[in-house]
Regions:
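Secretory/periplasmic and organellar redox-cofactor proteins
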Residues: 1-73, 120, 124, 129-153
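Short, intrinsically disordered, charge-biased short linear motifs at domain edges
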Residues: 66-77, 87-88, 96-100
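Short secondary-structure junctions and interdomain/linker hinges
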Residues: 75-82, 143
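Short, thiol/selenol-centered motifs that function as redox-active sites or metal-ligating centers
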Residues: 82-119
Length: 153
């Protein structure tokens, strides 16, 4: 096989592998991310939500990031039962939206933040965990504006 044919074959192979593995060509429907179907068992402990000091120290960025952690600490058993559509269950080993706020990931991810604020609002309106989860799966959280979220109480 000539050198030119080898180069062309390798170039073709490279292009095909690149195209087939490109994220923009993959289906947007990756299924429902992992969540816990029920609240933690009575007496079981779950990882605590980070506090403001643990999260930022002196490096606070946007008020809605810190405020999300304050709200998450009010509803840990609810967010424990919610999926997270940034798919951190696959890349980071998270098992629910709660995992995002037990670490710093939740502050850095718009998806996690929007889902948290959506969950908090729906919980405050008296929606059940199943109703809130159905809204998250449907994508209702996507409409939330993070710039105004810090005023949600």
């Amino acid at each position: 096989m000539s050198l030119r044919r080898r180069v062309l074959a390798l170039a073709f192979l490279f292009v095909m592998v690149t195209l087939l593995s490109a994220p923009w060509l993959q289906s947007e429907d990756q299924g429902v991310p992992h969540f816990n179907a029920a609240a933690p068992a009575k007496g079981a402990t779950i990882e605590p939500i980070l506090t403001k000091d643990q999260l930022w120290g002196e490096n606070a960025q946007f008020p809605y990031q810190t405020h999300a952690y304050e709200l998450a600490a009010k509803i840990p058993n609810v967010i424990y039962q919610m999926p997270c559509y940034c798919y951190c269950d696959r890349g980071m080993g998270h098992n629910s939206l709660h995992s995002c706020f037990a670490g710093t990931h939740g502050a850095q991810c718009g998806t996690c933040l929007k889902e948290l604020y959506y969950t908090y609002q729906m919980n405050k309106q008296g929606k059940t965990v199943k109703e809130i989860r159905a809204g998250i799966i449907k994508g209702d959280w996507k409409q939330l504006d993070l710039q105004t979220a810090a005023s949600i109480n």
